[in-house]
Amino acid sequence: HSGDPSIYGAIGEQMRRLDRFEIPYEVVPGVPAFAAAAAALKTELTIPDVSQSVILTRTAMKSSAMPAGEELENLSKTGATLAIHLSIRNIKAVVADLTPAYGEDCPVAVVYRVTWPDERVLRSTLLEIAGEVRAAKLTRTALILVGRALDPLTGSESRLYSAEHVHLFRHQKSG
C-alpha cells in the first residue's frame, strides 16, 4: 500500500524475527506511492515559495494511534504537502482536520492503485473531495495528497535556472 517496505509495513518486526532465528534476508526498496502518485499527476510536490516539505502520514482508524503531536491538525500548521496513506475511508475526518489551515480551495489529489492498470486519479479541493471519493466508491488502496503545490499554476520558478543565479557552471558576469 505504500510501495516501499520501509513505509507503513511490518518489515521491522519481520526483520527482527528473521534476525532472532539467524535467517538471512535482503531488503529490496520499492517506489514509494507518493513518488509514483506525483509522476501520475505530472506534478512536483515541492515548489519554491509554496512548499519545500513533504510529510508522509496517516490517520488513526482501527490501527495504532498516532503519536502525540502527529495528528493532521498539527501537521497542517506547517503548510507542507501532505501524503496521507491508509486513510481514504477516513476522508471526511481528513477534510475536517485540514480545512482550517489549508482552506476549502486547497488542491487535493486522490490516487487509487497508483501504477496499476486500473489506476484512477481524482483532482479536487478540500471542499469537494469527500463527495467525489464517495461517488467513485474508493474505499481502499488510495493515497491522498494535499497542498498548494498540487496547483500547477502556483509558485515561482526555481532560482537555479535564473540568469542571475551564480553557481559552479554559471559564473558571475563581469562588467
Regions found by a protein language model. Give the residues of each.
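A contiguous loop/helix-start segment that scaffolds small-molecule binding in enzyme catalytic cores
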Residues: P5, A10, M15-R16, S51-S53, ...
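Short glycine-cluster motifs
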Residues: H1-M61
